[in-house]
UniProtKB/Swiss-Prot annotation:
NCBIfam families: AcCoA-C-Actrans, fadA, PRK08947.1. It is found in: Cytoplasm. Catalyzes the final step of fatty acid oxidation in which acetyl-CoA is released and the CoA ester of a fatty acid two carbons shorter is formed. One of its GO terms (biological process) is fatty acid beta-oxidation. It is an enzyme of class 2 (transferase). Keywords: Acyltransferase, Cytoplasm, Fatty acid metabolism, Lipid degradation, Lipid metabolism, Transferase. PANTHER family: 3-KETOACYL-COA THIOLASE FADA, 3-KETOACYL-COA THIOLASE, PEROXISOMAL. Pathway: Lipid metabolism; fatty acid beta-oxidation. This is 3-ketoacyl-CoA thiolase. GO terms for cellular component: cytoplasm. Its EC number is 2.3.1.16. Heterotetramer of two alpha chains (FadB) and two beta chains (FadA). CDD domains: thiolase.
Length: 390
C-alpha cells in the first residue's frame, strides 16, 4: 500500500464531456466556457469539499479568442459559481495545454502555494477554428520548415522515417474505433462523462453522454478506399487515421494529500513524475518519447514498469512511431485500451486532462497501479505524466 506524504499531489476526481463533432455536431449551440462550467459544477457536486478552499482554477485552451478569450479560466470559475476568492488562469501549451494545467497545479501544491486546485481544458473547434486569428512570423521559416505547421505532414514524415505502412495505420485506426465503441457499450466511460445538454441533428435538445466521433460501423474496406489527406502523391495518412476535429472539455480536482485527508476524501491516484521536452518541429509527433524518458528517469522507473498507457494518438503514423521508439509495439494491449483520439476526437486544449482522466479510469478497471499519460505537441514538444493509484 502506498504511504502518502503531506505534499504528495493527489487526484481526487476527474470528469469530461462527451466529445462532439466539430461540423454540425451536438455541441454546435453550446459555448466552450458553458461546457467547462458544467464540469466544474460536477466536481463540486461529486466531492464533499468547500469550494472556498480552491486556490486557483487553471484551464488549458489553445485558441484564446472569441468565446475562449479574455482568460476563459477565470470566466469558467465565475460561471460555475465558484467563490470569487478563487483565482483563475488560462494556460497554452498547444495540444498539451490541460496537462500543463495539471503540472502547474501540481508544482504549486509541491511548493506550498495552495492545497486545492481545479484544472482542466477546453476547445470548441467548431466555434473557434484552429487557425483563427493566427499570424505567423515570416522569419520563422529560417528556423523550421513551414510544413512543420501542418500537423498532417509531420505525421507523414514520422511514418516515412519509421517505415510505418498504410496498412499498419489503417489497422491502428480501425482498432481505435473498435476499442472506443466497446468501452462505450460496456459502460467504461460512464464514470468520466458528465452529460451536457446539446442538440441532435434535427435540432432537438438532448443530453449528450456518448462520444459523437466514434465510428462503430468502420471497416477496413472503407478505410482502404480513402485517399491520402495531406500528401496526395505519396502520402499514407488519411482522414480515418487522423484524430478528428472535435469539441469538448475535461476537468480534474487536485489536492495535497494532507488536504484530502483533512476533508475525508479518498484520493484515486498520486502524481509520481512530470516532464516536458522539445524535439524537431518537423517531427512534432515524436515529442512523447523524450518527455516520457524524462518522466521515467524522474520517477526512477523504466517503460517496462508502466502497466497502462494513454497516448494522445494524433495520427496513427505518429502513435505507431512513438510506440516503436518506446519499445511498446508488442504491448499495444496496454495502450489506449478504451480507444484514442482517432476515435474519440482531439479538442486541443481539452485533451491533456481528458487522457489523464481516461487513464485513471482504465487503471481502476484493469486493476493496475502505475500509468503513463503522454502527448505530442505542435511545433515540436512532448508532455508526460506518470500516476500511481493509491
Amino acid at each position: 500500500m502506498t504511504i502518502l506524504s503531506p505534499k504528495d499531489v493527489v487526484i481526487v476526481d476527474g470528469v469530461r464531456s462527451a466529445m462532439g463533432k466539430t461540423k454540425n455536431g451536438m455541441f454546435r449551440h453550446v459555448r466552450a466556457d458553458s461546457m467547462s462550467a458544467e464540469l466544474v459544477r460536477a466536481l463540486v457536486e461529486r466531492n464533499d469539499f468547500d469550494p472556498r478552499d480552491v486556490e486557483d482554477i487553471i484551464w488549458g485552451c489553445v485558441n484564446q479568442t472569441l468565446e475562449q478569450g479574455l482568460n476563459i479560466g477565470r470566466n469558467i470559475g465565475l460561471l460555475a459559481g465558484i467563490p470569487k476568492t478563487a483565482g483563475g488562469q488560462t494556460v497554452n501549451r498547444l495540444c498539451g495545454s490541460s496537462m500543463q494545467a495539471l503540472h502547474t497545479a501540481a508544482a504549486q501544491i509541491m511548493t506550498g502555494q495552495g492545497d486545492v486546485f481545479i484544472i482542466g481544458g477546453v476547445e470548441h473547434m467548431g466555434h473557434v477554428g484552429m487557425m483563427h486569428g493566427i499570424d505567423l512570423n515570416p522569419e520563422a521559416s529560417k528556423h523550421y520548415a513551414k510544413a512543420s505547421n501542418m500537423m498532417g505532414l509531420t505525421a507523414e514524415m514520422l511514418g516515412r522515417m519509421n517505415n510505418i505502412t498504410r496498412e499498419e495505420q489503417d489497422a491502428f485506426g480501425l482498432e481505435s474505433h473498435r476499442r472506443a465503441w466497446a468501452a462505450t457499450t460496456e459502460g467504461r466511460f460512464d464514470n468520466e462523462i458528465i452529460g451536457i445538454e446539446g442538440h441532435d441533428a434535427a435540432g432537438r435538445l438532448q443530453l449528450c453522454t456518448v462520444d459523437e466521433v466514434i465510428r462503430p460501423d468502420a471497416t477496413m474496406e472503407q478505410m482502404q478506399k480513402l485517399r491520402p489527406a495531406f500528401d496526395p502523391v505519396s502520402g499514407t495518412v488519411t482522414a480515418a487515421t487522423s484524430s478528428a476535429l472535435s469539441d469538448g472539455a475535461s476537468a480534474m480536482l487536485i489536492m495535497s494529500a494532507q488536504k484530502a485527508k483533512e476533508l475525508g476524501l479518498k484520493p484515486r491516484a498520486r502524481i509520481r513524475s512530470m516532464a516536458v521536452a522539445g524535439c524537431d518541429a518537423a517531427i512534432m509527433g515524436y515529442g512523447p518519447v523524450p518527455a516520457t524518458q524524462k518522466a521515467l528517469k524522474r520517477a526512477g522507473m523504466s517503460i517496462e514498469d508502466m502497466q497502462t498507457i494513454e497516448l494522445n494518438e494524433a495520427f496513427a503514423a505518429q502513435g505507431l512511431s512513438v510506440l516503436k521508439a518506446l519499445n511498446l509495439t508488442d504491448k499495444q494491449d496496454i495502450v489506449n485500451i478504451n480507444g484514442g483520439a482517432i476515435a474519440l476526437g482531439h479538442p486541443l486544449g481539452c485533451s491533456g486532462a481528458r487522457i489523464t482522466v481516461t487513464l485513471l479510469n482504465a487503471m481502476e478497471q484493469s486493476d493496475t497501479e502505475i500509468g503513463l499519460a503522454t502527448m505530442c505537441i505542435g511545433l515540436g514538444q512532448g508532455i508526460s505524466t506518470i500516476i500511481e493509484r493509491v
